[in-house]
Swiss-Prot record:
The keyword Amino-acid biosynthesis does not apply. Its EC number is 3.5.1.n3. It comes from Aeromonas hydrophila subsp. hydrophila (strain ATCC 7966 / DSM 30187 / BCRC 13018 / CCUG 14551 / JCM 1027 / KCTC 2358 / NCIMB 9240 / NCTC 8049). GO terms for cellular component: membrane. It catalyses: 4-deoxy-4-formamido-alpha-L-arabinopyranosyl di-trans,octa-cis-undecaprenyl phosphate + H2O = 4-amino-4-deoxy-alpha-L-arabinopyranosyl di-trans,octa-cis-undecaprenyl phosphate + formate. The keyword Metal-binding does not apply. Belongs to the polysaccharide deacetylase family. ArnD deformylase subfamily. Catalyzes the deformylation of 4-deoxy-4-formamido-L-arabinose-phosphoundecaprenol to 4-amino-4-deoxy-L-arabinose-phosphoundecaprenol. The modified arabinose is attached to lipid A and is required for resistance to polymyxin and cationic antimicrobial peptides. It holds the Pfam family Polysacc_deac_1. GO terms for biological process: 4-amino-4-deoxy-alpha-L-arabinopyranosyl undecaprenyl phosphate biosynthetic process; lipid A biosynthetic process; lipopolysaccharide biosynthetic process; response to antibiotic. InterPro entries: ArnD (IPR023557), Glyco_hydro/deAcase_b/a-brl (IPR011330), NODB_dom (IPR002509). This is Probable 4-deoxy-4-formamido-L-arabinose-phosphoundecaprenol deformylase ArnD. It comes from the Bacteria. Transmembrane segments: none annotated.
Length: 299
């Protein structure tokens, strides 16, 4: 069997309420475990609407037919009214995920806030935002969270430094191939990073592949060895857990028939993480994604 890391981002109130239960059902049906990363604070995702003024973001929204893909409640969340508190109202679903023996980690306190402001926050504010999320998720689960995945892959050397004191087992904050330990400001290797190398649904549908051909496209990608390490794939509760749930169901079945086994990201870590190579986490760009994001680079 070929192991592929499965990262599941839960960005919004609706994704948690409607997408997570469906994903838990599908994953149980196919006997798959994955890594769920939850946003636990206010759902302000609708505040991204101002980015429609940016041509690349507008093109992405039109290409992916965002209104039907995500729903108007997601696209307007936190605009004309205060964003709903995801963790306070839907924490039981996070506990259900943990009880089902999936890996559970922090995505963000405020997904919109992190994605929109990471580039200008200082180290203290980055640490404060992480602490808000960690404390909330710890309280929800009744235990300490030991992994995280940056919202929108918005991460750079400063966020790497800010998250280091939290003692996570690993972070999944960037794009690239192969696990590594990012170098900190003093030259020491930091917490292991598990980069995502495969494209997400919204990054390729509409300009590189059609909706109906996406599963075939992804399975072809999985059949090709990555540049380094193992494949890591990200889905979103708002997409694969709601409007594309049937297609994701079919993908899980076809992958299993082809000898592909999805696993939590933590299963990809070696028994001794200090054996991982060092590298750098830097800002970069990626086709199909608007703005900058964290990328793996050579040390």
């Amino acid at each position: 069997m070929t192991e592929v890391g499965l990262r599941i981002d839960v960005d919004t109130f609706r994704g948690t309420r409607d997408g997570v239960p469906r994903l838990l059902q599908l994953l149980d049906k196919h006997q798959v475990k994955g890594s769920f990363f939850f946003s636990v604070g206010p759902d302000n995702m609708g505040r991204h609407l101002w980015r429609l003024l940016k041509p690349r973001f507008l093109l992405k929204m039109l290409r992916s037919n965002a209104a039907s893909l995500y729903g108007l409640d997601i696209l307007l969340a936190g605009t004309a009214w205060p964003g709903k508190s995801i963790g306070k109202q839907l924490g039981s679903l996070m506990r259900d995920t943990d009880s089902a023996r999936h890996e559970v980690g922090l995505h963000a306190w405020d997904h919109h806030g992190w994605q929109a402001n990471t580039g200008r926050w200082d180290e203290a504010e980055l640490a404060r935002q992480t602490r808000l999320g960690v404390d909330a998720l710890n309280q929800i689960l009744g235990r300490e969270v030991d992994c995280s995945a940056a919202a929108g892959w918005r991460a750079d050397p400063l966020t790497t430094q800010a998250k280091e004191p939290f003692g996570f087992r690993y972070n999944s904050d960037c794009r690239g191939s192969g696990l590594f330990r990012p170098l900190l400001q003093d030259g020491r290797p930091g917490t292991p990073q598990i980069p995502v190398n495969l494209p997400t649904f919204d990054e390729v549908v509409g300009h590189q592949v059609t909706v109906d051909d996406f599963n075939r496209f992804l399975l072809d990608q999985l059949a090709t060895p990555p540049a380094q390490g193992q494949h890591v794939y990200t889905i979103h509760a708002e997409v694969e857990g709601i409007v594309m749930a049937d297609q994701f169901d079919a993908l899980l079945g076809e992958a299993r028939a082809r000898g592909i086994r999805f696993v939590p990201l933590g299963d990809l870590l070696p028994s001794d993480p200090t054996t991982l190579p060092t590298g750098r986490l830097v800002r970069g760009t990626l086709p199909g994604r608007e703005g900058w994001l964290g990328c793996k680079a050579e040390a």
